[in-house]
Amino acid sequence: MSKDTIADIITSIRNADMDKKGTVRIASTNITENIIKILLREGFIENVRKHRENNKYLLILTLRHRRNRKGTYRNILKCISRPGLRIYSNYKRIPRILGGIGIVILSTSRGIMTDREARLKGIGGEILCYIW
């Protein structure tokens, strides 16, 4: 685990996806819970459970599987902001991923939200990651 929790989440999900594993275990923090709620709501993951192990809370994610074939859906997750280089955007300049098919997760003054929610509320923030 590094100090960049967002990169840890994205890397864990990407590695489990490439290794064709069905579940991922991630340390539970407020930021990780908010990002996972967005991924669950947008349909990129199937299920989330909170588990306590040795006085630490873990989130157990179930990745979304294809109906007829074995393996998970291929989601591309890309971390944008990092501790050494933060990327900020106002609501007018938030990028659209694949013409609106993908999502951008932002950290705003009103919490972590998707690009669509930020545009509707008219607020910008730090661009955390792209998912498509």
UniProtKB/Swiss-Prot annotation:
Annotated localization: Plastid, Chloroplast
Gene3D superfamilies referenced in this protein's UniProt entry, alphabetically: 3.30.1370.30, 3.30.1490.10
Predominant location category: plastid
PROSITE patterns, per the entry: RIBOSOMAL_S8 (PS00053)
GO molecular function (one): structural constituent of ribosome
Entries under InterPro entries matching the protein: Ribosomal_uS8, Ribosomal_uS8_CS, Ribosomal_uS8_sf
Record keywords: Chloroplast, Plastid, Ribonucleoprotein, Ribosomal protein, RNA-binding, rRNA-binding
Domain of life: Eukaryota
GO cellular component: chloroplast; ribonucleoprotein complex; ribosome
GO biological process: translation
Assigned protein family: Belongs to the universal ribosomal protein uS8 family.
UniProt subunit comment: Part of the 30S ribosomal subunit.
Function: One of the primary rRNA binding proteins, it binds directly to 16S rRNA central domain where it helps coordinate assembly of the platform of the 30S subunit.
Name of the protein described by the UniProt record: Small ribosomal subunit protein uS8c
